[in-house]
Each structure stands twice: as structure tokens, then as C-alpha cells.
Amino acid sequence: IVNRDSRNEMWSAVVATYTRALLDVTAQVHAVALEVLRAEGLLPAAARVDAADGTPPRPPQLEQLPLPGIPSSQVARVTSRMRARIREVVSERGILSTIDHVAELAQQHSRAQWQQQLRAAMGIDVTVGDPDLGLQVRAFRRTNTDLIKSLVDEHVDRVRRVLSDAGHGTRVEEIAEQIQAATGATESRAALIARDQVLSLNAEVTEARHAAAGITEYIWRTSRDERVRKEHKLLDGTRHRYDDPPVVDARRGERANPGTYYQCRCQAEPIIPGFDG
């Protein structure tokens, strides 16, 4: 059996890399949102609105500034401008190259994990070539490009709701605090995306490697910590076929292989024919 701590450390590093990248995107989104709101006169140029991890004191005279009700036409103009500017900035920062870098890191860790599994099963170092993983990598690229676009759109929609709900006499402080809360929600969503997507890519690449080696069965392995789902904990150490996955959510009756269910950190330990006795 491959050391679980070593295996988890490998993938935690990839998740951390992607999380940092998406949080950087979130910071860019936050900065552009403030830039547009200040340009529209909805926030004073000197007002401080920090990201969700801290709120330094703001000048009292700015906190108490009331705003008139914001016309729906202005809300539409602001959010349209904000959306376009954010997409431009995110594109300039080369998010596609970041996605590709994360995919390459995932493949490297998957390769190392595969070598460890072969060594554990066969007792010797075995060098094997990589299968064609182009399908999995292209799907990861496409899915994550769409997810980042949705991350931007969701943030702009949150800001739009803040502006639409601002009535006559709403203070700058209230708008600033609500935008800060919106940024915090976007940060949480970014972290979830990073973790789920890396885990899913690992599962898909692992299955492709196993299929290329003629492996059709696996042992379900969990991380054995307090975050493991009850159903998944019961599966730990059980044997399954890739083409007949077990039930992973009894309430919904959903079946899945390790790592393919939402936020699942479990992994498939291959059963290598001739070395499974």
C-alpha cells in the first residue's frame, strides 16, 4: 500500500498551487470592481475596501457619506463595464497558462504515484510510459476556463445585487461592507473549485493510467481523517471494478469511482493482475 501521508502531500501541493492562482484571480476581480465603482462615483476615491481577510479603519467622514438611490440604468452600466474589464484583466494575467501548468503538475504527481503503486505491488522499480492523456487535459482546460468565467460572473452578480438593493440614503460604509462580503464568498468559491478540480483530474488521469495497463479493478482508499464522508469511510479497503462503481451517496443513490464525486479525496489503489494475491 502506498503511504497515505505521502500521497496526500503530493496532491495537497497541487491543490495549494491552484488555490493560490484562483485567489489571485479573486483579488484582481475585487480590485477591478472597486476601480469601476470609484469611476462611477459610487465609492470615494480615498475609501478603503480591503479583501475579506481584513478591514482596516476607514475615515469616519467617508463612512457616513449617504448615497442617493442608484438608478437601474446605472447599475446595468456599472455591472456591464465591470464584467468586461474583469475579463480583460484576467485574460491579460494568463489564466490559461496557469490552468495548463496545474494540469502538468497533476500529471507529474500522478506519474510518481503510479510508480509508487507499481513498486509497492511488484517489489521492484518499473518504468512505464505515459498513456495519451490529451483527452483528460483538454477537458480540464475547458471546464476550468468555464468555471473561472462563472466565478467572475457570480461576483459581478453579487455586486449588482448590492447596488440594486441600495436605497436612498445608503451609506458608503454599507456598500463597502457588502462588497467585501461578496469578495469573501468569491474567495470561498475559488478554493472549492481548486480542490474539486484537482481531485477530479487526479481521478480521471489515474483511471486512464490503469486502463492503459489493463487494470480493471481497484481497492478504495480514503484519507482516513474526520472529513471523510460516512459512505466513503465504509468503502475504505473494499474491492471494486471501474465499470461498476459503488454507491457513494445512499440518499441520492449515486455511484462513482474514487475522486470523481464532488470534493471526494479518496483514491483508487490498483489491483494488478498477477500481483493481487
Regions found by a protein language model. Name each.
Residues 1-185, 272-277:
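N-terminal leader/targeting and assembly helices and adjacent pre-domain segments
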